[in-house]
Design a protein with these regions (language model features):
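A structural signal for short hydrophobic beta-strand segments in well-ordered beta-sheet cores
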Residues: 143, 476-478
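Internal helix-loop-helix
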Residues: 5, 13-16, 20, 24, ...
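A short, Trp-centered hydrophobic/proline-enriched beta-strand micro-motif
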Residues: 113-126, 454-462
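Extended, hydrophobic interaction surfaces within ordered domains
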Residues: 214, 229-342
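A short core secondary-structure module
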Residues: 115, 119-121, 128-166, 172, ...
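C-terminal helix-coil-helix/basic helical segment that borders enzyme active sites and/or dimer interfaces
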Residues: 2-6, 10, 38-47, 226, ...
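Glycine-rich beta->alpha junctions and the first turn(s) of the following alpha-helix
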Residues: 2-28, 164-249, 346-352, 356, ...
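Glycine-rich phosphate/cofactor-binding loops in nucleotide/flavin-utilizing enzymes
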Residues: 2-18, 98, 303-366, 572, ...
């Protein structure tokens, strides 16, 4: 049974907050040491060809940067790596982080003090002791050669070093080595954890370099004028800038999640062994997106970012160099873990209360599911008894007062189960919360019990032939006639209108209002009201959607929800609930991915390497979408609140199309058959890859198209309107 345990996590939350503040303070300290505004040891990326790595190494040692490994302070390492990335600086901080944890105590102390300047290599020297190309080895005194498989390694002195000119600046280096001065042996599993930390630091550095390019490009869109207006006002620039922002946020989010998983696993062995997969997912996404981020920024900056006086040209080199370092690993590591090892995407921890509630939801779903088929009526009745349809309502209104995270859990798990009570949940999220805020006592008395029981059969009357994403342009009108309103107009693409008892209807009550959204009012209208005509249509997905005509429909003023001309407030208040609902798309994609993996695991060795690489990229993007949904749920105000929701929506929607297409192509013609048919790989009742493909476009165009969402992202970044 659900319990409100609001005080049980306060100490953990406070501890996490304190740790985050400490990491931020450390990053600020690192930035201060590096410098800014053209002054300091390495103030910006323009210092890349002339910066003194040796002097910076000495300063870093004085500040204790090389001792992070002795504390296994991965979050601090990643924070410092980001500051280095912003400045295109390849200080081998992560190499020292690993070395100090595997070398004998006396040598480790010398690394921490900066006396030994160590770089890592997973490649053994050639017969003559030569080794290269190596990153950040210009002033290295030693190289630590490690074998990931065996856990063995050796520390060799650097006899000489020579620059190898090319893409990387500072240049990569080829060294010659002397005989080993120390042998090391580490448990292979432990060594993999340490080397994963190094990979994660490089990934963070690469994303930070790309993000700095993006930051410069965004600023450029506001000040650079062409054809009489800022270039940020052009739609093409807005779309590209928003797409780049999506990649930056997604890659950053996965790096952050990998850090959190690794720290949790280090603190508690009972959490499982998922950190390696979390790192692989982050690295996969960084490899896929980092250089695209750089190119996108370069395209926006134009010629100004193409010359060496500008940071972008040096950041461009850093992004590409770091990507090459990361890409040396297996491109299909994620998919091999999922397909060959039977692993699942790392679970997202929403906190003790939410995760405890997740187990309750799992138990109820299992109780009402037989042979993979859920009994929707039995589940609805039990959820009504438990009060779950009013989970997030205040206790004073008959709800359970649950946290947003617990509401997310319920919505996610129901969607992962195939959405057996979708309509009831939609009524809760979209109607229930709005009625609580704006409904009259009579409306609350009439409708809240139905919603609480999961029996409210409604449809949403928003879209019109000329009003889709631009809801403020709706034309269906309501004219007051005494105590009644007369409604005339047409609504399009109204899902479930043919079975609805009521429509949540947005109409124009002031045709002359400025701005346009100021003249909209909401009504809750019975669908059997005279003058309403429903015309069903079968969608590409096979679902029924309807055109609904309103011809002289008379409704009493008591059907109005909220103030006259105040409907926009009622509509936008529902966005608070939308933060919870948006997790449903990502949960559906996870369900579809798991269904695909179930089929592929029957013959894992028949999956081609190229298909595994493709699957790895899709899995990484799905995990990023899931992480961003959680961030959107928790973002209440500020720039992130305006950006992260649309970012998660765009990423999830486009992923739905790509995952559905990949599923069909990986399985061949059999994958396009309905489950249960003789040649289908799926039993009856299982996920239909055919249906997933046909419904996928709606995730991109429904509820505000992705193009519009990217425009919202661009404006949140400060770009002007077209």
């Amino acid at each position: 049974m659900y319990e409100n345990r609001s005080g049980s996590q306060r100490s953990d939350h406070d501890a996490r907050k304190a740790q985050q503040e400490a990491v931020r303070d450390f990053a600020t300290s690192v930035a201060g040491t590096l410098g800014s505004a053209g002054a300091g040891l390495w103030p910006d990326a323009v210092a890349a060809p002339t910066g003194d790595l040796l002097k910076l190494h000495e300063a870093a040692a004085e500040q204790g940067w090389f001792e992070l490994g002795s504390e296994s302070a991965l979050d601090f390492l990643v924070a410092a790596s980001r500051e280095l990335g912003k400045r295109a600086c390849p200080l081998p901080l992560a190499d020292a982080y690993v070395a100090i944890q595997v070398l004998p105590e006396e040598l480790a102390a010398r690394v921490g003090e900066g006396e030994l300047r160590v770089v890592l290599s997973e490649v053994a020297p050639d017969g003559a002791g030569g080794l290269g190309p190596l990153e950040g080895a210009q002033h290295a005194t030693h190289v630590l050669v490690l074998d990931r498989a065996s856990g063995r390694g050796e520390l060799r002195p650097v006899a000489s070093a020579a620059y190898e000119d090319g893409l990387a600046v500072p240049a990569w280096v080829r060294i010659s080595t002397g005989d080993a001065v120390a042998q090391v042996e580490v448990e292979p599993a432990r060594l993999r954890v340490l080397l994963d930390a190094q990979r994660l630091a490089v990934a963070a550095r690469a994303v930070a370099a790309g993000a700095r390019m993006h930051e410069l490009a965004v600023a450029h869109t506001v000040v650079r004028r062409q054809f009489g207006k800022p270039i940020g006002a052009f739609g093409a620039v807005q779309q590209r800038t928003a797409a780049t922002e999506i990649d930056v946020m997604a890659a950053t989010a996965l790096v952050d999640q990998a850090v959190q998983v690794a720290l949790a696993e280090a603190a508690d062995a009972d959490t499982g062994h998922v950190a390696g997969l979390a790192v692989d997912l982050a690295v996969r996404l960084v490899v896929d997106t980092a250089t695209g981020i750089g190119f996108g920024a370069q395209h926006t900056l134009g010629a100004i970012g193409f010359f060496e006086e500008h940071e972008a040209s040096w950041l461009f080199r850093r992004v590409h160099a770091d990507k090459l370092l990361l890409a040396r690993g297996a491109r299909d590591a994620v998919a091999r873990a999922l397909v060959h090892e039977g692993r699942s995407l790392p679970r997202l921890d929403l906190g003790e209360r939410a995760e405890s509630f997740r187990e309750e939801v799992h138990a109820q779903l299992a109780r009402h599911t037989t042979d993979g088929v859920t009994d929707p009526e039995g589940l609805r009745a039990e959820m009504s008894r438990l009060g779950w349809f009013a989970l997030g309502w205040p206790e004073a209104d008959g709800g359970l007062g649950a946290s947003t995270e617990e509401q997310v859990v319920l919505h996610e798990e129901l969607k992962y189960a195939g959405g057996p009570v979708d309509r009831a949940m939609s009524a809760t999220m979209l109607l229930g919360h709005s009625l609580l805020r704006h409904g009259t006592p009579e409306q609350k008395e009439a409708f809240l019990p139905l919603i609480r029981e999961g029996r409210m059969a409604f449809c949403l009357g928003y879209s019109e032939p000329e009003a889709g994403s631009d809801l403020a342009s709706l034309r269906t009108k309501a004219v007051r006639d005494g105590d009644e309103w007369v409604i005339d107009g047409q609504k399009s693409w109204t899902t479930r209108a043919q079975t609805a008892s009521h429509v949540w209807l947005a109409v124009r009550t002031d045709p002359d209002a400025t701005p346009r959204h100021a003249g909209i009012t909401i009504f809750l209208v019975p669908m059997d009201t005279p003058g309403i005509e429903v015309q069903p249509h079968v969608a590409l997905s096979g679902e029924i959607s309807c055109t609904v005509f309103y011809d002289g429909v008379r409704v009493p003023d008591s059907a109005r929800v909220g103030e006259v001309d105040g409907g926009w407030k009622v509509i936008t208040d529902a966005l608070a609930a939308e933060r919870v609902v948006m997790g449903g798309v990502a949960a559906t994609m996870r369900r579809n991915l798991d269904a695909l993996l179930t089929v592929l695991r029957r013959a894992p060795h028949e999956v081609a390497d190229a298909d595994l690489a493709r699957l790895s990229s899709l899995a990484a993007r799905l995990q990023a979408a899931r992480v961003l949904v959680v961030r959107a749920t928790r973002a209440m105000e500020g720039a992130e609140a305006r950006t992260v929701g649309p970012v998660a929506a765009v990423l999830s929607g486009e992923l739905a199309e790509e995952l559905a297409e990949a599923s069909i192509e990986l399985l061949g013609p059999a994958g396009a058959l309905a489950p249960g048919t003789p040649d289908s790989p799926q039993a009856a009742g299982a996920v239909s890859f055919d249906a997933a493909l046909r419904v996928a476009p709606m995730y991109v165009i429904g509820g505000g198209t992705n193009d519009i969402q990217r425009g919202i992202i661009a404006r949140a970044l400060g770009l002007p309107r077209e």
